[in-house]
Design a protein with these regions (language model features):
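Active-site-adjacent structural elements that line small-molecule/cofactor binding pockets in enzymes
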Residues: 1-123
């Protein structure tokens, strides 16, 4: 799949945590070089499940609840650590699926916390 991406794509996306996408991006960069393409021409985006909590005490329980899926759980400060690690891994865009963030005002509040407290680590 990365061979096709390296030849034809403008953007590459995968569900991931920072270490996974960093390793896969390195593979993509090598595939680009093998195909004579500048790896910088391909934007990288990712997504994971997000659970915004008031405390990190239960974060591991949320991560285990969705075992096998990329997941970030905890306070906005803890989420910001992952956001910064994605940035350092070369990610250009993080997609935040909102179906794990509650409903109505709870969802809006969680998104606001991500935007205001965690997203600045990506800039």
């Amino acid at each position: 799949m990365l061979g096709v991406v390296s030849r034809h794509a403008d953007e590459w996306n995968m569900w991931s945590l920072p270490p996974e996408i960093a390793a896969r991006r390195a593979e993509l960069d090598r595939a680009c070089e093998a195909n004579g393409r500048d790896p910088g021409e391909i934007a990288t985006s990712t997504q994971a499940l997000f659970f915004v909590l008031d405390s990190n005490d239960d974060a591991d329980a949320y991560i285990q609840m969705v075992a096998g899926r990329p997941c970030v759980a905890g306070t906005p400060d803890r989420i910001a650590e992952s956001v910064a690690a994605w940035r350092e891994a070369g990610v250009d865009e993080i997609i935040v699926p909102d179906f794990t963030l509650g409903r109505g005002a709870e969802r809006t509040d969680a998104l606001d916390r991500i935007i205001e407290e965690a997203a600045p680590a990506f800039r």
